[in-house]
Structure formats: structure tokens, C-alpha cells
């Protein structure tokens, strides 16, 4: 099991839309993540900075950040690109966050 955290950047004024889209996450995306070993995945929003903090666990070495070649992921990126800071391929700009403390 591996834990990973990273931050992403939400464009101002799109908080409710971001929540709405994730409340209706595509079943095929959820299945692909789960089949890929991603679980216990949460995203938190800092309303003062519009930074999104994501935390996830994986059963293997691959995380959601390694699944960008999958067409389902690419379609999701395109769907979310208008409300997030993105790279030229529409992947969200992400910055890995090193773990500095953990308690079971």
C-alpha cells in the first residue's frame, strides 16, 4: 500500500461546479481507478486559495497520476479543463506533496 497526496488548482468561482461534477463521477472512471488499485481517494478544497488537496491510497506502485494514457482519464481531463488550471494536454496542473507525518 502506498499513500500519495498532491495539490491542484481550481479556477475562482467554480467550487460548486467542481463538487457537482465529482458528485456525479462517471462509473467507468471510478471503476478504472478502482481496478487500477486506487482507493480511499479524497479531495479537499481550500476556499482561501482555491487549491485542491488530494489524498489517495494505492494497492500497487501506480497512482491516479500514472493513468493519464487511459482514454477515460483523458476524457475526464477534457471535461474538467474549463474549471481548473491545466497543462497543454488538459491534465490538471498537479504538485506532489511529500508526506511529513502519518499516524495509523
UniProtKB/Swiss-Prot annotation:
A GO MF annotation of the entry reads: L-rhamnose mutarotase activity
Q: Give the EC number(s) under which this enzyme is classified.
A: 5.1.3.32
What Pfam families does its record include? rhaM (PF05336)
- Which pathway or pathways does this protein act in? Carbohydrate metabolism; L-rhamnose metabolism
The listed locations are: Cytoplasm
Quote the catalytic residue positions: 22
Q: Which SUPFAM superfamilies match?
A: Dimeric alpha+beta barrel (SSF54909)
Q: Supply the alphabetized keyword list.
A: Carbohydrate metabolism, Cytoplasm, Isomerase, Rhamnose metabolism
Q: Which family does it belong to?
A: Belongs to the rhamnose mutarotase family.
Q: What do we know about how this protein assembles, alone or with others?
A: Homodimer.
The protein depicted here goes by the name L-rhamnose mutarotase
Amino acid at each position: 500500500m502506498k499513500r500519495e497526496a498532491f495539490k491542484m488548482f481550481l479556477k475562482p468561482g467554480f467550487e460548486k461546479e467542481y463538487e457537482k461534477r465529482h458528485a456525479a463521477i462517471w462509473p467507468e472512471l471510478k471503476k478504472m481507478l478502482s481496478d487500477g488499485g486506487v482507493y480511499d481517494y479524497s479531495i479537499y478544497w481550500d476556499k482561501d486559495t482555491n487549491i485542491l488537496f488530494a489524498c489517495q491510497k494505492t494497492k500497487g506502485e501506480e497512482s491516479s497520476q500514472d493513468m493519464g494514457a487511459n482514454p477515460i482519464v483523458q476524457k475526464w481531463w477534457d471535461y474538467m479543463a474549463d474549471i481548473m488550471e491545466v497543462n497543454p494536454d488538459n491534465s490538471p496542473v498537479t504538485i506532489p506533496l511529500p508526506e511529513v507525518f502519518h499516524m495509523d
